[in-house]
Amino acid sequence: MPNGRPVQNGNRLPTSNWAACLEAEAQAAAQREAARLAAQRQAEQARAAAAQAKQRQPEKPIAPQKAVLRQGDVVFFTGDSLMQGVAPFVQQSLKQQYGIASINLSKQSTGLSYPNFFDWPLTIEQTFKENPNIRLMVMFLGANDPWDFPNPKGGAYLKFQTPEWEAEYLNRVNRILDAAKQHNAQVIWLGMPYMKKKKLDDQMRYLDKLFAAHLKDKVFWIPTAGLLSNGGAEYSDSVEVGGKIVRYRSKDGIHFSVEGQKLLAQAIMQKIEFAQP
C-alpha cells in the first residue's frame, strides 16, 4: 500500500475508492463490535435471570440430625431379642437423664415375616392408640426374617430375596412407618449387625441394604455393623478399643455381650436430644 493508499493489480486505487474501502472496513468493525456487545449483554441477562430464579426457589429445609424429646414424651421400644438386651440400658439413661418414660415391647423370636406368630405392625398401631404421648419409636429387628413366608393373597410362598418378597415385606415396614407418622412420632431404626455364620451374615447384609435404601430420609438410621466391629468390614467377637480388647458379641455369634448392648444403647442416646420447656 504505497503512499498510504491500497494497491489493486499493481495499481494504486483512486482516492475515492480508497476512502470507500476504509469506510467499509470501519462499518464491518463496528458491526462486529456491536454483535460482541449484544452477545455479552445476552449472557449477562441470562446469568441475572438464573440468579433471580434461584433466589425465588424455596430452600430445602435441613433435616434434623437427632430425635427431639420434651418433658412428658414417651419412648416406645420395638424389636426382637437383639433389642431386648439393648432397650433396658436406653430406658435407664432416658429416665435418669431426662425423666422420660418408656415402653418396651421387644420380644424374642419375632419379626415381620410371620405375623400369625406375632404381628408387629398391628401391635405398634394399637400401642400408639393406647399411648398418645409416644413421640419416639426405636426399632431393631430383622434377624428372624430371612425366610420364605405365605403370600397374604394366597398361592405359593413368597421366596426370600425375590421382588415379590421384598414388596410384601416393605408393605409391613410401611405400616409401621405410617402408624408412627399418624401419631407424630419420630423413628430411630437400627441396621443389621454382622453375623458369625456366613449364610446368616449374607442374609443380614441383604436386609441391611434393603432397610437402608427404603428408610432413607424417613427415620434416624443407625448402622450397627461397623460400629460393633470398630470399623471393620466383617464379623468379630472382640475388637481393640483404646488399647484394650473388648468383647461386643455373645458366643452364639448373633447377640451381644453386655458391653455390646451398652455400645448400641449409647449410639441410640446419641441420636436423641432433650428440648427444655
Regions found by a protein language model. Give the residues of each.
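N-terminal secretory targeting modules
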Residues: 1-74
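Conserved SGNH/GDSL esterase-like catalytic core that processes O-acyl groups on lipids
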Residues: 65-163
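Stable alpha-helical elements in mature extracytoplasmic
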Residues: 82, 86, 90, 120-124, ...
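Sec-exported extracytoplasmic/periplasmic mature domains
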Residues: 83, 91, 95, 99, ...
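Hydrophobic/aromatic beta-strand patches that form the interior of the parallel beta-sheet core
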Residues: 138, 188-190, 220-222
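Active-site segments of SGNH/GDSL-like serine hydrolases
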Residues: 143-144, 150, 174-208
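A short acidic, glycine-rich active-site loop
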Residues: 158-170, 249-254
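Catalytic His-Asp segment of secreted/periplasmic serine-dependent ester chemistry enzymes
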Residues: 194-277
